[in-house]
C-alpha cells in the first residue's frame, strides 16, 4: 500500500479537520432551522418559536402568545403566575403532581367541556433550575389536541410555556415543539 509523502501527507489532517468542522456547523444550524428567538422586554426569559408564527395579544390571557399563520389552531403561550417567593418548583409537588394539577385546573377544568390525559411528566435540570416537562392529550367536543408544556419557578413566579396542536398534526410537529419547549430559559 502506497503512503502519501511530502506536502500531500501534511494536507490530509488539515482537510479532514476542515471537513469535520463543516459537518459540525451544518448540523448545528439544522438544529435551530425553522426557529426564531423571543426575549422578554425586561430580559428575564427567552425561548424559541417556529418561523412563520406571529405574536398576538390576548387581553386578560397569557403573557405571550404566538400562533401559526397557516395552521391557526397551533399555539405557543406563556403564562406567568404568582407563587410564594420562598417556594421552589419541587415544593409544589413532583412533575406528575404538578402536571395533574395543571390538567385539572387549567387544561381541562370541570365544566369546560374538555378532558385531558397527562401522557408524560419528567423533571430536568437546566442551568441549576428544575423544570417539569409535561405532555398531554386533550379531547374537545369537536377534535383532539396534543400539548407540550414546561414549568419552572423563579423569584415567586411560576412560568408555564405550552405548545399545542391538533392531534392529526402532532406527528409532524412533535420534534419542533420539543425543541421549542426545552428552549425556554430564565436569563437573570
Regions found by a protein language model. Give the residues of each.
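Conserved polar/disulfide-associated segments of primarily extracytoplasmic proteins
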Residues: 56-153, 158
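Bacterial N-terminal signal peptides that target proteins for export
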Residues: 2-17
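Surface-exposed amphipathic alpha-helical segments
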Residues: 155-188
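Bacterial signal peptide processing site
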Residues: 29-31
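Short, low-complexity, disordered segments immediately C-terminal to signal peptides
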Residues: 33-43, 62
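Soluble non-cytosolic domains of exported or imported proteins
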Residues: 44, 92-100, 167, 171-175
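Proline-anchored loop/turn motifs at beta-strand termini and strand-loop-strand connectors
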Residues: 42-59
Amino acid at each position: 500500500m502506497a503512503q502519501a509523502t511530502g506536502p500531500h501527507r501534511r494536507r490530509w489532517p488539515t482537510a479532514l479537520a476542515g471537513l469535520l468542522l463543516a459537518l459540525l456547523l451544518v448540523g448545528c444550524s439544522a438544529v435551530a432551522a425553522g426557529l426564531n428567538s423571543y426575549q422578554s422586554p425586561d430580559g428575564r426569559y427567552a425561548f424559541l418559536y417556529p418561523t412563520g408564527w406571529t405574536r398576538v395579544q390576548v387581553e386578560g390571557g397569557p403573557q405571550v402568545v404566538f400562533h401559526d399563520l397557516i395552521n391557526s389552531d397551533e399555539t405557543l403561550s406563556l403564562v406567568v403566575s404568582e407563587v410564594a417567593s420562598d417556594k421552589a418548583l419541587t415544593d409544589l409537588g413532583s412533575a406528575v403532581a404538578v402536571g395533574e394539577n395543571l390538567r385539572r385546573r387549567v387544561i381541562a377544568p370541570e365544566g369546560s367541556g374538555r378532558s385531558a390525559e397527562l401522557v408524560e411528566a419528567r423533571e430536568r435540570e437546566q442551568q441549576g433550575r428544575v423544570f417539569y416537562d409535561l405532555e398531554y392529550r386533550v379531547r374537545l367536543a369537536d377534535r383532539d389536541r396534543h400539548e407540550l408544556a414546561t414549568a419552572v419557578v423563579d423569584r415567586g413566579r411560576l412560568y408555564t410555556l405550552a405548545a399545542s396542536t391538533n392531534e392529526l398534526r402532532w406527528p409532524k410537529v412533535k420534534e419542533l415543539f420539543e425543541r421549542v419547549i426545552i428552549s425556554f430559559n430564565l436569563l437573570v
